[in-house]
Amino acid sequence: AADSYYQQFGDKNFNGGLGFIYQYDSRDIPVNAWKGFYLNASATFYGCYLGGDNDYQVYQLDVRKYFNLFNRQGSTLASQLKWRASTGDVPYGELSQPGTPFDLRGYTWGQYRAQDMIFAIVEYRYMFMKKDQTLSKSGVVGWVGGGTLGEKMDEYEGFLANLGVGYRFEVQPRMNLRIDFGWGVETFGFYFNFNEAF
């Protein structure tokens, strides 16, 4: 079936917007946090008055918390809650889309699109120890998560379950090469990247 958003907006749009961001960050190392808290809240207002093709708004909230477990280095429980909502004449390419290497890993990016999306992930990260009790360069992760999408908050439909495992190799101090295998509902994804997903 043809996508109504694609039929309305096509694949080419120019959009200009103004907005604001509030951010708080107490993470020890942003690209590979072992402890701390992160909050990012933003609102962006796009309009034809700025030379764009569409009038719409995007609101986002990203909350992350990191805990050290078992009183040892390299043992971290990371959690994330993210909400994204849009209103107005939202272009096809600006709809919320899970499935990137930084959210519900395991879904195909663009397979699901809607104006609103919310998801949560909990991930355990473990770096192995050497015999001398210093951290090695290798580690593993495992995560569970899920989310939902809809045209409005009161119209969310279905649940996108998510889980996965991964391997980490430290290429620089506290900067990892990331290999992840994620599963969604009847979908699978493989990810090769640097730094943690969140």
Task: For every predicted segment, state its role.
Residues 1-7:
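Transmembrane beta-barrel wall of Gram-negative outer-membrane proteins
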Residues 7-11, 18-134, 192:
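C-terminal outer-membrane beta-barrel translocator/porin domains of Gram-negative envelope proteins
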Residues 181-187:
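A short, acidic, flexible beta-alpha connecting loop/helix-capping segment that sits on the rim
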Residues 19, 169, 187-198:
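Outer-membrane beta-barrel "beta-signal"
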Residues 164-166:
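ATP phosphate-binding glycine-rich loop and adjacent ATP-lid/helix-beta elements
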Residues 125-160:
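C-terminal hydrophobic structural anchor segments
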Residues 107-113, 152-156, 182:
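Short, contiguous acidic/charged loop-to-helix segments that flank catalytic cores in large enzymes
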Residues 173-181:
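Low-complexity, intrinsically disordered Gly/Pro/Thr-rich segments
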